[in-house]
């Protein structure tokens, strides 16, 4: 048509898409048709209701993560869930799920995500006496591309009331692999935080090489400083008032701790035991089955910021790809990985979350009852 008419290709396409729109040049009519008529393309639906019904439980098992993260691990998760007979897929549905894109996942799950549609407060108090002995991180001795350099932070479970003692969670995040360990303590006393850090060190699948903390007194103290010197662990701190210096662990404070246990107040020994029982399952679920996208580059062009992330991978996958992780450690990680069922871990986590919520509900009922009894005239109304 382009050769016959001499039209530009895209001009000809526009005329044809208009389905005969009248174009007049002088007394001649080049193209005449019904302007109101439009040719509607009808594409068959590839990912139908059968695919969605199987995708939804997998998405729930994976903690409702975004399509990009889910697509990266979906083939592996399907294989594991079929191994433990958590799901049954027909050949056609299985083929479609293995080929589905991240965008299609988000589109299919958009309505479900809307159905499931407070922020924490910092309780950090500065520790000043030892600041001059603990260097601010300058990245000269800090190697973020090697496993073992971690950021640490505390997450308070005060429920909006910072009076008295309440449970705290020590969050330890490896910068290179994003491997995360958590442990709850009864309060922010240095002795409990120090013991929790030593306990977490025994669970890390790699040697602890460096620690970076904020300026809280629970970290800036002689116990931790002397321990790091004795164990030859690099100990650095962020700049005062610059929370983004610990951006990796700050992200995990929400995505791991807050998403799992919420913002309620936990201050009893029973709740402390429940928190740590939950964290035992959560560390396996998060580190082996939750893909993470790491920021590769960030470019600003005027008011626009363009961010580039790497391919989503779990902390376990990142460790297995690292050349500096020994074959012995990789073998141990692989042996643990093949025994894990993400659906079972998710059920156990959900059960422990429900128990935690029950303790909170009981306390609220008791507080309401106490408040009512303390009101003037309550005895008269009761009689």
Pin down the residues of each PLM region:
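Secondary-structure boundary/capping micro-motif
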Residues: 2-210, 215-243, 248-383
């Amino acid at each position: 048509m382009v050769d016959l008419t001499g039209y530009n290709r895209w001009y000809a396409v526009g005329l044809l898409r208009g389905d005969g729109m009248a174009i007049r040049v002088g007394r001649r009519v080049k193209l005449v048709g019904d302007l109101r008529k439009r040719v509607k393309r009808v594409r068959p639906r590839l990912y139908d209701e059968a695919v969605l019904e199987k995708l939804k439980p997998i998405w729930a098992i994976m903690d409702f993560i975004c399509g990009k993260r889910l697509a990266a691990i979906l083939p592996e998760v399907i294989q594991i869930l079929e191994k433990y007979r958590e799901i049954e897929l027909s050949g056609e549905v299985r083929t479609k799920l293995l080929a589905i894109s991240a965008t299609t996942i988000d589109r299919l799950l958009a309505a479900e995500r809307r159905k499931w549609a407070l922020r924490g407060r910092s309780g950090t108090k500065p520790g000043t006496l030892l600041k001059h002995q603990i260097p601010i991180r300058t990245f000269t001795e800090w190697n973020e591309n090697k496993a073992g350099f971690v950021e640490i932070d505390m997450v308070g479970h005060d429920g909006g009331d910072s009076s008295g003692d309440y449970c705290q969670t020590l969050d330890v995040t490896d910068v290179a692999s994003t491997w995360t360990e958590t442990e709850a303590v009864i309060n922010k006393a240095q002795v409990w935080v120090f013991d929790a850090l030593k306990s977490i060190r025994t669970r890390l699948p790699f040697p602890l090489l460096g620690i970076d903390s904020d300026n809280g007194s629970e970290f800036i103290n002689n116990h931790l400083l002397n321990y790091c010197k004795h164990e030859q662990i690099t100990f650095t701190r962020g700049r005062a008032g610059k929370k983004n210096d610990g951006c990796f662990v700050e992200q995990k404070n929400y995505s791991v701790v807050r998403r799992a246990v919420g913002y309620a107040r936990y201050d009893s020994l029973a709740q402390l035991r429940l928190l740590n029982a939950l964290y035992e399952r959560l560390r396996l679920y998060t580190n082996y089955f939750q893909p993470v996208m790491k920021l590769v580059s960030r470019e600003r062009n005027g008011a626009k910021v363009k961010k580039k992330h790497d391919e989503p991978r779990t902390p376990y996958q990142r460790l297995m790809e690292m050349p500096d992780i020994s074959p012995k450690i990789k073998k141990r990680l692989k042996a643990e990985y093949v025994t894990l069922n993400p659906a079972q871990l998710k059920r156990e986590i959900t059960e422990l979350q429900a128990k935690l919520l029950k303790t909170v509900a009981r306390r609220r009922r008791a507080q309401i009852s106490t408040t009512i009894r303390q009101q003037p005239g309550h005895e008269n109304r009761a009689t």
